[in-house]
Structure formats: C-alpha cells, structure tokens
C-alpha cells in the first residue's frame, strides 16, 4: 500500500509541475504571431509566428542579412538595430558589440530570439540582397590547397556587386569524401605527404558561409571564388575538416549551388591616394577584384602596387593576368615574395615574408607611407604582421582596409 501511495504522490507531483510549467510558458512566451516593423516602413514589415531567431525570420521573408558563420554568433556580421522589443543583449553578443553600440540598440540578428513585437532598423542596401541558384562552370586547382570555383548566374540576372564584395553560399546536409577529390598530379605531393585523402566531412544541417568574389563587376554572368581547403591542423589531426570548403571542393561542373548577396564593406575609397594591395593565399580573391576594377573598368590613374606572398612557385596563380595588367598600365606594378622557394622554381625574385619584403624594398624609402591606402587580405598571421608594420610607419587606421576572412 505504501508503495502504491508513493507512486500516486510522485505522479501527482509530476503532473502539478507540468501544469505549472505549461501555465508559465503560456504567460511568458508569446506563441502567437508577432509583427516585425522595419525602418518604420509598412511595406517592409511583416507578421510571423513568435519563437524563431530574428536572422531566420528575416531570411524567410526574403531579407538576407550577412552572416558569414551561418548564424553561429561567431562572425559578428548580422548586425541590426533594435528600437523596441529585443530584450536584453546576450553575453555571446558582447564580444562583437561595444557598450556604446549596445546602448544604441545594436544586436546580432542570429542571437535575438523573437518573443514579442519588434521595431528594427536595417541599412537600405540589405533590401537589394537576393538569392540565386547557380550552375558550376568549373572548379579547378590554382594552387595545392586553393581551387577557383566559377559559377554561372541564371540567364538575364545580374549580381549588382562592388569590387571587394562577397556572397554567401548555402549547403544542404551532405557527406564529402576527400578520396573523391580530383587533385592534379602537380599538387598531390603534399596531399599524399600529409595523408589528407583520408578525411571525410559529414554535415547534418544546412550551412552558410561567406566568400569574397575574385571577379570584378564587368565580368558579367559569373561569380568567381578562390577557396582554400580547411584541413585539420597537424597539431589536431582528428579535428573535423572545414564544412563549407570541403563541400565546395567536391563540386563538379553542372552542379547547382545556391548563393545570396551581394554583401560587403571592403570597398575602395574614391580618392587619388596611392593604393597598396597586400595579399596571401586565398586572400588573392578580393585583390584581383579590386585591381581589375581599378584598371579595367575605372581606368584609374592612381599609383597602384600589389604585393603577394606565396610559399613556392607552385602556389602562384593569375600570374599571366597581372603580368598583362602591368604591361598595359604604367601606374601598376606587382611583386611576389616566396617564403619557401623550391630548387626547381629557379626563383630569382623576392624571398621571405611579404610584410618584410614590402618594408625593405618599398615602404622604408617611401616619402610618405602614411598617405597611402593599404588594402589587405590573407591569413591571420600575415594580416597581423602587416598591420603592426604599418602602425610602426605611422599609418592611421583610416588608411588600413582589411578583408579579415580568417579572423
């Protein structure tokens, strides 16, 4: 009898707690529809069920806010201004948003759980962002760990981007086996040496990542990307490989890919100042876009130089393109520094790290480096070294433009 009584009492307690939780939820959580008012514009506003993240709500209503990390809260790009209804800012947002910005209502859309009516402000350019289903034209190795992905935009459509901008690529759940990658013989040495073909990438949920475009606006009908495969570092060999880079490397001509855009803020200033471009690795992409745009579309007469760092001759690409630009434009010069030239390279050019080469062979004798505009994109260590070097030369922040894809 005591056992039965105990079971009955326990059941009643569980039922009572369940009722209390459901009652509290009904009072505290809005499970009905809410209204998101945007820029005080009725045509841009919408009604939706409560409970989803603001980033997802906006996307489902055709408003695509940049989020390079796919909504994970790590990139800090999906900034919106909330005027009313957003609740308190979360600790996960404070590493990307200053106290002053927080007071002004700045939030990360991927971290805002919409429970009540919202009033928000978005930049007008966001409403020009669209989605396209593109077709893979080609996906070829340009270096040992870098592929050039060329996508065809649907006929009649235009992606209205500016040089230095980026798009986002979407990937559905998938499994990629590195053993299936088509890596040309000339690049297979390091792949075999580090046993990279053993890896697999298993992705169980939709993923979004951002990539800078390598083409410039007058290369119509295509999107051109330089994508470095993100293999696990040697110190952590069992870490999972990069989700999106693995997916992109698996793409073949004819495959369909969903992109959204354009996005960006890594744009050239409209001045007459000298432009110095500094790149490394897959950071080539926005460098190519900018330099082609300046010389081919704008026919700029500004003094322009490009300093690119690579490991060996095998890792250099677009060499003929930049040689031709240099031959056709007296105001443009480009330079490569190899950090580890191989005997077969027969290299007679600059050697070492690109920031040292730039300093020793140009900037240390420059009459006014602080008056130049510096545009850079490369691995985080390169970016940090270049920025320190520029600061030591007295270059102000306003003249240092960084596409921080690896930060």
UniProtKB/Swiss-Prot annotation:
It catalyses: a ubiquinone + n Na(+)(in) + NADH + H(+) = a ubiquinol + n Na(+)(out) + NAD(+). [2Fe-2S] cluster binds at residues 69, 75, 78, 110. One of its GO terms (cellular component) is plasma membrane. GO terms for biological process: sodium ion transport. Residues 32-126 form the 2Fe-2S ferredoxin-type domain. Keywords: 2Fe-2S, Cell inner membrane, Cell membrane, FAD, Flavoprotein, Ion transport, Iron, Iron-sulfur, Membrane, Metal-binding, NAD, Sodium, Sodium transport, Translocase, Transmembrane, Transmembrane helix, Transport, Ubiquinone. Its EC number is 7.2.1.1. It comes from the Bacteria. Disulfide bonds: none annotated. It is found in: Cell inner membrane. Binds 1 [2Fe-2S] cluster. Residues 129-269 form the FAD-binding FR-type domain. Its main location: membrane. InterPro entries: 2Fe-2S_ferredoxin-like_sf (IPR036010), 2Fe-2S_ferredoxin-type (IPR001041), Beta-grasp_dom_sf (IPR012675), Cbr1-like_FAD-bd_dom (IPR008333), FAD-bd_FR_type (IPR017927), Flavoprot_Pyr_Nucl_cyt_Rdtase (IPR001709), FNR_nucleotide-bd (IPR039261), NqrF (IPR010205). Pfam families: FAD_binding_6 (PF00970), Fer2 (PF00111), NAD_binding_1 (PF00175). It is a single-pass membrane protein. Its cofactor is [2Fe-2S] cluster; FAD. GO terms for molecular function: 2 iron, 2 sulfur cluster binding; electron transfer activity; metal ion binding; oxidoreductase activity, acting on NAD(P)H, quinone or similar compound as acceptor. The chain crosses the membrane at residues 3-23. NQR complex catalyzes the reduction of ubiquinone-1 to ubiquinol by two successive reactions, coupled with the transport of Na(+) ions from the cytoplasm to the periplasm. The first step is catalyzed by NqrF, which accepts electrons from NADH and reduces ubiquinone-1 to ubisemiquinone by a one-electron transfer pathway. Composed of six subunits; NqrA, NqrB, NqrC, NqrD, NqrE and NqrF. Belongs to the NqrF family. This is Na(+)-translocating NADH-quinone reductase subunit F. It comes from Yersinia pestis. The gene is nqrF.
């Amino acid at each position: 009898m005591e056992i039965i009584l105990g079971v009955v009492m326990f059941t009643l307690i569980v039922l009572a707690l369940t009722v209390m939780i459901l009652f509290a939820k009904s009072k505290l959580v809005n499970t009905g529809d809410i209204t998101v008012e945007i820029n005080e514009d009725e045509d841009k506003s919408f009604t939706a069920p409560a409970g989803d993240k603001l980033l997802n709500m906006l996307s489902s209503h055709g408003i695509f806010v940049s989020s390079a990390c796919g909504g994970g809260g790590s990139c800090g790009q999906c900034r919106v201004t909330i005027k009313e209804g957003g609740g308190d800012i979360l600790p996960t947002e404070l590493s990307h948003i200053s106290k002053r910005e927080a007071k002004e209502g700045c939030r990360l859309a991927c971290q805002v759980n919409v429970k009540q009516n919202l009033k928000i402000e978005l930049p007008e350019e966001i409403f020009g962002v669209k989605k396209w289903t593109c077709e893979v034209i080609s996906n070829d190795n340009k270096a040992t760990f870098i592929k050039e992905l060329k996508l065809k935009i649907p006929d009649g459509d235009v992606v209205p981007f500016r040089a230095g901008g980026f798009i986002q690529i979407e990937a559905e759940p998938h499994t990629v086996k590195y053993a299936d990658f088509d890596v040309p013989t000339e690049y297979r040495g390091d792949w075999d040496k580090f046993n990279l073909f053993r890896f697999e990438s298993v992705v169980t949920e939709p993923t979004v990542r951002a990539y800078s475009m390598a083409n410039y606006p007058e290369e119509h009908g295509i999107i051109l990307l330089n994508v470095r495969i993100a293999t696990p570092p040697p110190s952590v060999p069992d870490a999972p490989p990069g989700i999106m880079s693995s997916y992109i490397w698996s793409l073949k001509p004819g495959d369909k890919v969903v992109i959204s855009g354009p996005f960006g803020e890594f744009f050239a200033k409209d001045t007459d100042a000298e432009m110095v471009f500094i790149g490394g690795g897959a950071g080539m992409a926005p460098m190519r876009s900018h330099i082609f745009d300046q010389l081919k579309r704008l026919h700029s007469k500004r003094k322009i130089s490009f300093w690119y760092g690579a490991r060996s001759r095998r890792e250099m690409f677009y060499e003929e393109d930049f040689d031709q630009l240099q031959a056709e434009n007296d105001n443009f010069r480009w330079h490569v520094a190899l950090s580890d030239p191989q005997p077969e390279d027969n290299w007679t050019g600059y050697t070492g790290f690109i920031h040292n080469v730039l300093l020793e062979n140009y900037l240390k004798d420059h009459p006014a480096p602080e008056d130049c505009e510096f545009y850079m994109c490369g691995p985080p260590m390169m970016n940090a070294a270049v920025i320190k070097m520029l600061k030591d030369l007295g270059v102000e922040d306003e003249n240092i433009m960084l596409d921080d894809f690896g930060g």
